[in-house]
Amino acid sequence: MTLVLVNPHAKGGRVRHMLPAVRRVLDELAPLPRLHAPDTVQDALDLLMREPEGSRVVLVGGDGSVNRWLPALLTRQLHTGLVPLGSGNDLARALGLDRQHWPNALALALQGNTRPMDTGLAVWTDMHGDSHCTPFTSSLTAGFDSSVALRALQGPRWLSGLPRYLWATLRELQHLRHWTVRAQADGQHLDDGPVLLMSVLNTPTLGSGIAAMPHASTHDGQLDWLRAGPFGRLGCMHLLPRFLRGSHLTQPGVQVGRFKQLGLHCPQGIPLAADGEWLGLARQVQVHVQAHSLQMVTGNV
């Protein structure tokens, strides 16, 4: 029987109230899927790690849910369907799943064909010298957009999606900072100096639909890097609407590229987030692509 794993904390806890409706839909199916809504990340990981290798699971939640459960999905090589009920849903957007009503998305997640997608892996060192290993599906942000992600997580519950991200962006502009970063992509030295952000994308969007890297692909065997120089507040306000439209790539001070391996060094420590989930301050970051490492159900992409 297929495991359906619900994150009851997704969308500010509102997904918990949808459990009876999800159960009613599943009760009509044969064979009956197994429905679980674990309260902790560890409980969810334990459930996934007990699944037979290569079996199908369905996740109900958003980018953060997938990110927290990703280590088990990769280890067990699970074929994964996604019902996007999170605040951001940038992974679902890239897979063509974001416009479906949830019962239709659930039916597709249970029965749809899977396709291999790339993931990223970040090995990073925090300010205490401790090493961490973090996989991601959508984005690994460093700098301003990570600070925005943290502020968004702390934002008012009545805001969700893109409005919540824009609220956090405007609040973070009041505390604008820059970071001195040394970077290399596939052995090639990138520009040194202060940056507003130095981020990695696997999906075209981040932050609930901001088109940070419009041409990014989840299945091309590469990741995309995005560097923005030391823009001030006025420059950021000029850049923001272009980010929303995906027309920022040709702006002075913005650089992009593709890679398989990327290294970042920031002695002062740069804010880091994966799939919108806060990680901490990092001095060293090594990122590489894990090509075709996750089997995902896709929509019309």
Task: Describe each region flagged by the PLM.
Residues M1-V60, N67, P71, T75, ...:
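ATP/NTP phosphate-donor binding region
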Residues L3, P38, L74-H79, L85-L196:
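Catalytic core of DAGKc-family lipid kinases
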Residues T141, D145, S199-M213, W278:
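Glycine-rich phosphate/pyrophosphate-binding beta-alpha loops
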Residues D145-V148, D191-G193, T205-G209, R233-C236:
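Short acidic/glycine-rich loop or secondary-structure boundary segments that cap or lie
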Residues A152, M213-A216:
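Short Gly/aromatic-enriched secondary-structure transition segments
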